[in-house]
Regions:
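Residue-level detector of anion-binding/catalytic polar loops
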Residues: 38, 115, 143-144, 207, ...
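Peripheral (often C-terminal) accessory segments that flank ATP-dependent C-N-forming ligase machineries
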Residues: 258, 262, 282, 288, ...
């Protein structure tokens, strides 16, 4: 018998990633076992939470038209549908960006005592901030880190850029510390272009990290999850981008190849998987997490931890799952039942 009955898949977000989040959420909801669970789709954006669709076990999906979507009661995470109060047993969080990847949504569910699919509020907060996560992992003999510098909104951009180029050299990657889907990221080849790239990154948040570009042979990614007491790594993917790096166009407009399993040596594959398991354990992760890396002549470099990776038919994690021999439905059941 299933551990939970009423599963709320919550998607949409307050960030630039909200449309990607909707696609991930709808895909996830459609793949949750229709014979075991009642699935409810909750669209949440800027404080407005509405039930947009539901599918009772062994029944067809029912969508609610705009203007007639039941409002979710955030005091206890429930909803009234046709005179019946439904209190959700479990939250499957598919919000990319804020608040689903910032720790705020996890904190809400933890205060209510509602189990959810992702890491704790603390781990999510640390992992989502690129600079904080690197600082947390640095010096732990887990993986290499590219040299970096950080600037906060309000600080002198020109002075920062001059000092950063002098310290790190070129080329550089400029990133918002708390954004995903490659929003706000620029590769900088010339020193005179750095201030504009920093200002662009500030459109996505209050802090910007500038990293020295790593001369990499491979860009690799690995999904990790918990199954009972075991931390398991999925087959790894190599990303080959037509744009030179994995920007938004490469991710979502078909300008990249994502090869699974990655055509790299068994030694490198095992190193990526073991490193991913070690980081997962060290951070205290839960649910499905994706780790991204660059492989260079002098070792494996950490890029980021993705607490809520994309879950559409074309996303990387579903490719890993299928390559592992599992169906998406089987995998989602494992995540739900082990949360």
């Amino acid at each position: 018998m299933a551990k939970y009955q009423s599963i709320a898949v919550i998607y949409g977000s307050d960030s630039s990633e909200w449309e990607v989040s909707c696609r991930s959420g709808e895909f996830t909801a459609s793949r949750i076992d229709e014979f075991q669970y009642d699935v409810y789709e909750v669209f949440a954006r800027f404080g407005k939470w509405n039930l947009v669709a539901m599918r009772k076990a062994n029944s067809m999906r029912q969508a609610f038209p705009e203007g007639a979507q039941p409002v979710v009661d955030k005091s206890d995470f429930s909803v009234m549908v046709l005179g019946e109060k439904i209190k959700f047993d479990f939250a499957y969080i598919m919000q990319h960006g804020a608040p689903g990847e910032t720790g705020l949504l996890q904190g809400y569910f933890e205060m209510l005592g509602i189990p959810h699919s992702t890491c704790s509020a603390f781990v999510t907060t640390v992992a989502f901030d690129k600079y904080a996560c690197k600082s947390y992992l640095r010096g732990k003999d887990l993986v290499k880190m590219a040299p970096d510098a950080i600037i906060h909104r309000g600080e002198d951009i020109e002075e920062f850029c001059s000092a950063t180029v002098a310290a790190l050299g070129l080329p550089l990657f400029v990133k918002p510390t708390r954004a995903g889907s490659s929003f706000g990221i620029t590769k900088v080849e010339r020193a005179e272009d750095l201030p504009a790239a920093v200002r662009f990154a500030f459109t996505e948040g209050e802090q910007v990290i500038v990293e020295k570009a790593v001369k990499a042979q491979h860009e690799l990614t690995c999904g990790v999850y918990r199954d009972g007491k075991d931390i398991k790594a999925l087959p790894i993917i190599e990303i080959v981008s037509q744009t030179g790096w994995f920007d938004y166009d490469a991710k979502y407009n078909g300008l990249s190849q994502e090869i699974c399993p990655a055509p790299v040596s068994e030694e490198l594959t095992l190193r990526v998987q073991e490193t991913s398991r070690r980081i997962y354990r060290y951070l205290g992760c839960k649910g499905l997490v994706r780790m991204d890396y660059l492989s260079a002549d002098d070792g494996l470099y950490f890029l980021e931890v993705n607490i809520i990776p994309g879950m559409t038919n074309a996303s990387r994690v579903p490719k890993m799952i299928r390559t592992s021999g599992q169906t998406i439905t089987e995998f989602l059941t494992t995540i739900i039942e082990n949360s």
